[in-house]
């Protein structure tokens, strides 16, 4: 069943990309120009939004970002202290996690597995 779903998604994405590439009459320059205009509009919109942020909030965000940089440095230092074997294991583990992430998303979005409205969950909320 899962293989059929993945196969169906692959086919639909492939045919969709093919159809988009063959049906498009825009030249690469037109696409680039459109992307530049869209990008500039997004930047302008964000600048307007960012102008509404209070100075205290900006300072808070800056402090947050500095702390995140410090945390990431510490994570790199911890990782570099690991043995090569441990680093290799973590790299392989990450590859397996990435392989599992797509099927996991498909399963999570399956209506049969969605129990948010089940009677059991409603009973627990009422207690």
Swiss-Prot record:
Swiss-Prot/TrEMBL keywords: Cell membrane, Coiled coil, Lipoprotein, Membrane, Palmitate, Signal
UniProt keyword annotation of Lipoprotein present: yes
Coiled coil: 56-101
Region (Disordered): 102-127
Signal peptide per UniProt: 1-16
Main location: membrane
Lipid positions (S-diacylglycerol cysteine): 17
Cellular compartment(s): Cell membrane
Membrane topology: Lipid-anchor
GO CC, alphabetical: plasma membrane
Positions of N-palmitoyl cysteine lipidation: 17
Protein name: Uncharacterized lipoprotein RP051
